[in-house]
């Protein structure tokens, strides 16, 4: 899908060279504490590589959606504290890259770029102001490569630009799923948004040997074919052509766990599809579906998974997602899992070990797999 990207190992790094690293620091922070550090850990090998070669690192990133205005709760300051501890060296924090004088510090973390409207507007003047802090640019933020933003696109055209280690890993792993993967290939989709996942379902019905759908995504497909889903979450979106619902490769749950409320401790029951009551929510896939999906996965050589099988943020309804993870982990196959909700559940249950690749991308992963050009990747290719 994509030509080989020019990466760090292709870069001539001189001692004292200032390198702007666009990182992915979009993580949940509560009361100043980082909830999940996995995205931060993903950039550490790139930072360590540069430090070993005496480069001066300038970290740029975003957090949340402040809408072009400053928000104390979306400051990157806590990220700086984590990086300093993880790397064992000082990380200077700058609250304003545009007022920052040139510095000889080994590492500087600039404030949340989305505090300025120029970032999301892909403003070239904004990018030029950032470029003054660097002699070269590295993109280590695959998760936002589908965004046409200044630090992702324009900045890559103003400096010699390279792909970070994790970004290259993402592109290689997802390309491996798309280009001549070992067969049988099984794709598993869950979650909510049908407008982003329906193109993938259709694509993999053509390319894969089996497509398994669960979660709220399956609820929507049940509703589209006329099955009752009670009060369940659906996302009807734009679905003019429903012929894919009859594809023999498409596998939906045959039984589900239902509950009166999607909260811990709520009374629940198992229902066959077609027997869900009007006052019930579909909360998870049922035990027969878990067994059936495990059988479909047996013998697979390539597996792609994005999206939980139910309301997995509630532990009572995470069993289907956990069962899916356990089935995939034991395969002798190339396995890729992605999507923030899915990865979060697997991490909480210590189930990430055994997957060939855990993607940090959400929307970027889906767009890549749909065959769309990602602006951030294209900007690197133009180099």
Regions found by a protein language model. Give the residues of each.
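Active-site loop-to-helix "anion-binding N-cap" substructures in soluble metabolic enzymes
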Residues: 1-383
């Amino acid at each position: 899908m994509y030509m080989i990207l020019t990466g760090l190992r292709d870069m001539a790094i001189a001692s004292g060279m200032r390198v702007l690293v666009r990182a992915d620091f979009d993580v949940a922070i509560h009361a100043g504490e980082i909830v999940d550090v996995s995205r931060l850990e993903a950039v550490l090998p790139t930072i360590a590589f540069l430090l070993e070669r005496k480069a001066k690192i300038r970290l740029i990133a975003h957090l949340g959606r402040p809408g072009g205005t400053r928000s104390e709760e979306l400051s990157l300051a806590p990220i700086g504290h984590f990086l300093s501890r993880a790397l064992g060296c000082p990380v200077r924090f700058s609250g304003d890259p545009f007022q920052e004088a040139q510095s000889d510090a080994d590492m500087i973390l600039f404030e949340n770029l989305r505090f300025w409207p120029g970032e999301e507007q892909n403003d070239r003047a904004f990018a030029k102001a950032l470029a003054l802090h660097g002699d070269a640019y590295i993109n280590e933020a695959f998760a936002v490569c589908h965004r046409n933003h200044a630090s992702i696109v324009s900045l890559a055209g103003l400096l010699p630009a390279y792909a970070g280690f994790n970004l290259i890993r993402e592109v290689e792993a997802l390309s491996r799923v798309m280009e001549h993967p070992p067969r049988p290939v099984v794709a598993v989709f869950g979650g909510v948004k049908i407008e982003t996942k329906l193109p993938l379902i259709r694509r993999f019905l053509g390319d894969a040997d089996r497509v398994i759908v669960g979660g709220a995504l399956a609820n929507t497909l049940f509703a589209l074919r006329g099955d009752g889903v009670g009060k369940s979450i659906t996302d009807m979106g734009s679905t003019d052509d429903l012929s894919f619902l009859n594809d023999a490769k498409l596998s939906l749950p045959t039984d589900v766990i239902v509950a009166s409320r999607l909260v811990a401790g709520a009374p629940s029951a198992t229902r066959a599809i077609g027997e869900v009551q009007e006052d019930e929510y579909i909360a998870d896939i049922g035990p027969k579906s878990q067994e059936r999906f495990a059988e479909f996965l047996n013998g697979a050589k390539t597996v792609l998974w994005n999206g939980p099988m139910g309301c997995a943020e509630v532990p009572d309804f995470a069993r289907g997602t956990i069962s899916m993870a356990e089935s995939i982990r034991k395969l002798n196959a190339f396995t890729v899992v992605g999507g923030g909700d899915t990865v979060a559940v697997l991490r909480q249950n210590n189930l990430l070990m055994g997957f060939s690749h855990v993607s940090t991308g959400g929307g970027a992963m889906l767009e890549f797999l749909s065959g769309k050009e990602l602006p951030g990747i294209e900007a690197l290719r133009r180099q």
